[in-house]
Amino acid sequence: MQVQCNEKAFKGGFIINSQIATAPPKTLDTTITIGKPTVEDGAAMWELVNKSTLDTNSPYKYIMMCEYFAETCVVAKENERLVGFVTAFIPPEHQDVIFVWQIGVDSSQRGKGLASKLLQELISRDICSNVNYVEATVTPSNKASQALFQKLAREYNTQCEVSECFSEDLFPGDDHEAELTFRIGPLHP
């Protein structure tokens, strides 16, 4: 099966290039542990987001995700310090989808493949045994996330379809871009 990133028609569209050249990843530090979050990790997730360009949610959101969605969230720690996370959930109406809400990686770990390792950990969990698609929304300017999900499609030798999800006019104010849905799959032929 060929890896494809298919663009669907949408206002202000752009072309996704599935052949993006990326530098080889730096070595991931072997002192990093990857696992399920606890409620105590919620504050550290929020702090990591606050130091980045990610959309900031309330601290409550991160604590709640750790409490009620620990099976579909992943944290990475270096010497007990949180250096990365994924928050995700399986939509009740689409049990074959894992929706990735947010991925955060500390600046000390960027470019080392940590985000990919976090996604692989998530997909390999028992709770995702019936998951055949990974979905996420990504803004047009977020090239790093676009490349991450395109890489995931290549790793699974599957498709990456891109379509409009939420147009910019749905967001209050003038500073939020449209959100595009990236749908990777099927993961299992």
Curated annotation (Swiss-Prot):
Transmembrane segments: none annotated. GO terms for biological process: ectoine biosynthetic process. PROSITE patterns: GNAT (PS51186). InterPro entries: Acyl_CoA_acyltransferase, Ectoine_EctA, GNAT_dom. CDD domains: NAT_SF (cd04301). Its EC number is 2.3.1.178. The keyword RNA-binding does not apply. Residues 32-183 form the N-acetyltransferase domain. Keywords: Acyltransferase, Transferase. It comes from the Bacteria. It holds the Pfam family Acetyltransf_1. Pathway: Amine and polyamine biosynthesis; ectoine biosynthesis; L-ectoine from L-aspartate 4-semialdehyde: step 2/3. GO terms for molecular function: diaminobutyrate acetyltransferase activity. Belongs to the acetyltransferase family. EctA subfamily. NCBIfam families: ectoine_EctA. This is L-2,4-diaminobutyric acid acetyltransferase. It comes from Halalkalibacterium halodurans (strain ATCC BAA-125 / DSM 18197 / FERM 7344 / JCM 9153 / C-125).
